Regions:
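Amphipathic alpha-helical packing elements
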Residues: 1-40
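Long, hydrophobic, well-ordered secondary-structure blocks that form the structural core
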Residues: 32, 41-45, 50-53
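A structural signal for small-residue-enriched, beta-sheet-centric alpha/beta enzyme cores
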Residues: 48, 54-63, 70-81, 85-154
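Short, conserved acidic/polar surface loops in the N-terminal third of protein domains
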Residues: 34-35, 62-64
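Short, structured secondary-structure boundary patches
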Residues: 39-42, 119-120
């Protein structure tokens, strides 16, 4: 993986240039050995990384943590998440049906990036809880699985 190839995936995802530092940070985070992106990206359970932006950078770039932040309408959320997903697939080889063995997956695997909603948060910000100063911006990555849906119409 090179910075140029990561930039190509960001452009394909529609990222604005100012989003790229978050994309780089996200990729460095998922490539950490202890995160185990290989296990998450290739499981049959449909797991995916979720990216939580905390601090001023979220406001500066328009990463949303308010109502509807997981859906369409927030370019930063969608394109940062999509750029990281493209890189995992295109550069890491996690192609559906090949290395990615998800039997069924979920929309969050396409793009799952959002901001911490500090204004509505009743506890200290995540970055502070993790030992960073309040004036620092951070990106936290969690391995997530999607919804479980049962439809009984009989």
């Amino acid at each position: 993986m090179t910075i140029e190839k990561l930039a190509m995936n960001s452009v394909m995802a529609g990222c604005l240039p100012e989003y790229f530092p978050i994309v780089v940070t996200g990729m460095l985070a998922v490539l950490r050995t202890e995160f185990n992106i290989g296990g998450l990206a290739t499981t049959t359970g449909g797991g995916a990384p979720g990216f939580i932006v905390s601090g001023r950078v979220a406001d500066d770039l328009g990463v949303s943590g308010v109502t509807g932040c997981f859906g369409p309408g927030y370019r930063a959320n969608s394109t940062i998440g999509w750029a990281l997903r493209l890189a995992i697939r295109n550069l890491g080889g996690a192609h559906p049906g090949d290395m990615d063995k998800s039997t069924q997956t979920w929309p969050g695997k396409l793009a799952f990036c959002f901001a911490e909603n500090e204004a509505r948060n009743s506890v200290e910000p995540l970055r502070v809880a993790e030992g960073f100063s309040a004036d620092t911006s951070t990106l936290t990555v969690h391995g997530l699985r999607g919804v479980h849906y049962n439809n009984e119409t009989a």
